């Protein structure tokens, strides 16, 4: 299922500013040209010699169809319940809707540094699940190759678009702009899922992004329920009126 197969209205999601990096309310995916809404954003950093050092700031965008899709099981849960729920974030990761990730640099990184750390996290996830195969090993090689000659100064961004079918589109930007097309497409569903899993999943590198996604989706699912109830009431009233006329 994609937004073109099952169009949903774009949720009202205000922009977020995280450590001087602004994430707009919506973006157009370089993989599909679909408009996705901002699910949440947060920093990735480490405690170094008693000081928290921020390396990157990460924004996560979702297809609007994710809201009714997730509402089936998770509507009514609080932000706290969703934040602590591994199955909820797993459902976002594997859900049949498009996702987009924007990773903006706060400190300079080389493509090699970034890609080696990401693939290290991905391989750890696969091995813990017992699903690391030759196909994934080849996808990792391709991922490392795409990043090999890249450098990312502060303010530059790495962009990932995850299709419902499982492809991972990789793009780069030296500023806040998002290119219309990606630099490379890697056809490996597990790699695409693992990139997002490493950010907001069980062993996430950005607890802040995970919290914001839970917070925003809890509110959007609540609003979705109100809209569904209103539509249902309108339909029932219309049916009652129709029956009254027939009688």
From Swiss-Prot:
A Pfam family hit: Chalcone
Biased composition (Basic and acidic residues): 223-235
Annotated site, Important for catalytic activity, chain positions: 114
Binding residues for substrate: 56, 121, 198
Any one GO molecular-function label of the UniProt entry: chalcone isomerase activity
SUPFAM superfamilies reported for this sequence: Chalcone isomerase
Enzyme Commission identifier(s): 5.5.1.6
Origin: domain of life: Eukaryota
Entry keyword annotation includes Isomerase: yes
Keywords recorded for this protein, A-Z: Flavonoid biosynthesis, Isomerase
Pathway: Secondary metabolite biosynthesis; flavonoid biosynthesis
Enzyme kind, highest EC tier: isomerase
Entry-linked InterPro entries: CFI (IPR044164), Chalcone_isomerase (IPR016087), Chalcone_isomerase_3-sand (IPR016088), Chalcone_isomerase_bundle_sf (IPR016089), Chalcone_isomerase_sf (IPR036298)
UniProt region (Disordered), positions on chain: 223-247
Biological process terms in GO annotation: flavonoid biosynthetic process
Reactions catalysed, as given in the entry: a chalcone = a flavanone
Entry keyword annotation includes Transport: no
Function according to Swiss-Prot or TrEMBL: Catalyzes the intramolecular cyclization of bicyclic chalcones into tricyclic (S)-flavanones. Responsible for the isomerization of 4,2',4',6'-tetrahydroxychalcone (also termed chalcone) into naringenin.
UniProt record similarity statement: Belongs to the chalcone isomerase family.
Additional note from the record: Part of the biosynthetic pathway for all classes of flavonoids, a large class of secondary plant metabolites, many of which are brightly colored.
Protein name: Chalcone--flavanone isomerase
Species whose genome carries this gene: Raphanus sativus (Radish)
